[in-house]
């Protein structure tokens, strides 16, 4: 038991070093629970620790004779890691805030920004800024007749830029967004023509990567197709970004916590919902969370 807890604490320290604060805190909470249980077991046998019960206990848990010192050392190490985690979290929050401000400033001045999503890196522009969107098309070499999805911060944004939504839309959004799902709906009059390119529909994305979420919240609705030249592979890793794309983006934020699976695309504009692409979210998951999609094609 003691060796297991020691290994767990080492794992926590590794996660902190990797700046994976959420996972580190989760692992530390689990380990602290184990430490409490360990301490309770020690208290139960404390009176007879050096007798037969104590011998059996030490053998069962594979711990040395000086168990109280070991227990104290484990608790001290857990406390040290909690303080280290808090310090690192504050440092990374400051770094996140700086990067959000830098990306937001670029996007608010008609510039482009490379930001991570769950799937690949995206090349982002302010969706309501025609100059910026035209620049994005030019940099990517994207056909001008190819419409763009809107990256939004909230369900309210989806309602603002769409119309004739199905009654189960809020349930669908609540279950899967933020996340790797694109929802296609009828476009409202609030969607600029340079986004829908004459189409009556528009796709909505809500990325789950923290920095990209915060940038969208700060700037407003963004467009963000994959950060590659048209025809090239989509960049799953920062190293995959082409020099031409990097040169034309004022800001590029690295975060390789991307898992590389395609987004799932669902079209809700017809009488029957259509699954246009099954990606990270499967048909089975959609049906389990939203039974109203039972007739999906």
Where are these regions (language model features)?
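Long, low-complexity or tandemly repetitive, helically biased scaffold regions used
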Residues: 13-73, 77-88
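Short, well-structured alpha-helical segments
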Residues: 6, 71, 173-174
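Active-site-adjacent structural elements in enzyme catalytic cores
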Residues: 90-297
């Amino acid at each position: 038991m003691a060796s297991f807890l020691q290994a767990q604490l080492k794992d926590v320290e590794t996660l902190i070093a990797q700046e994976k604060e959420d996972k580190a805190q989760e692992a530390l909470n689990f380990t602290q629970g184990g430490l409490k249980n360990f301490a309770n077991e020690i208290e139960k046998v404390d009176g007879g620790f050096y007798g037969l019960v104590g011998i059996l206990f030490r053998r069962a848990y594979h711990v040395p004779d000086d168990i109280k010192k070991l227990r104290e050392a484990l608790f001290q190490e857990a406390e040290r890691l909690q303080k280290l985690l808090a310090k690192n979290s504050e440092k990374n929050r400051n770094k996140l805030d700086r990067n959000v401000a830098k990306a937001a400033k670029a996007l608010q001045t008609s510039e482009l920004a490379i930001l991570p999503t769950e799937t690949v890196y995206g090349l982002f522009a302010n969706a309501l800024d025609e100059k910026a969107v035209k620049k994005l098309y030019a940099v990517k070499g994207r056909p001008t007749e190819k419409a763009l999805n809107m990256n939004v911060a909230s369900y309210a944004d989806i309602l603002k830029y769409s119309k004739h939504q199905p009654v189960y839309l809020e349930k669908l959004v609540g279950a899967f967004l933020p996340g790797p799902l694109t929802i296609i709906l009828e476009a409202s009059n609030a969607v600029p023509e340079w986004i829908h390119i004459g189409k009556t529909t528009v796709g909505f994305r809500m990325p789950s990567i923290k920095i990209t979420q915060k940038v969208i919240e700060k700037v407003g609705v963004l467009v963000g197709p994959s950060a590659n030249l048209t025809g090239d592979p989509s960049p799953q890793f920062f190293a995959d970004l082409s020099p031409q794309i990097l040169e034309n983006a004022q800001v590029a934020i690295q975060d390789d916590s991307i898992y590389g699976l395609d987004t799932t695309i669902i079209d809700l504009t017809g009488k029957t919902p259509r699954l246009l692409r099954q990606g990270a979210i499967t048909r089975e998951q959609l049906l389990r969370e939203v039974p109203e999609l039972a007739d999906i094609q």
